[in-house]
């Protein structure tokens, strides 16, 4: 089984409740890596203790996971999906590439805990995310952003 199919096998619970899983991902990202919260102007004033259950955090987390779902379902044929995301994250949001690596690890942890992603699935997700992040980084370099 390929990496994409292995991860998609566990995607159902995430897809069934993007808001809850997205909220968990961003809350964990911000609590484990507090500096990342500063990259989201609308979340800067939210206390760490108030992140979980915050509707705006959950909504943005849902957006992140929906996009990841599109990327997973594209099974590597993702240039048309990824290009606009990479452009906006470089030129508008100014998100350093290392932050994609941080959120990728958090997504893996949340999927393991909440969707049953096993060890092989976690490695498959790491492989997929490494490719996606490398493609984002290539766009960043083309744009002169690093």
From Swiss-Prot:
O2 binds at residue 60. It is found in: Cytoplasm, Sarcoplasm. Keywords: Cytoplasm, Heme, Iron, Metal-binding, Muscle protein, Oxidoreductase, Oxygen transport, Transport. It is an enzyme of class 1 (oxidoreductase). Its main location: cytoplasm. Monomeric heme protein which primary function is to store oxygen and facilitate its diffusion within muscle tissues. Reversibly binds oxygen through a pentacoordinated heme iron and enables its timely and efficient release as needed during periods of heightened demand. Depending on the oxidative conditions of tissues and cells, and in addition to its ability to bind oxygen, it also has a nitrite reductase activity whereby it regulates the production of bioactive nitric oxide. Belongs to the globin family. This is Myoglobin. It comes from Tetraodon nigroviridis (Spotted green pufferfish). The gene is mb.
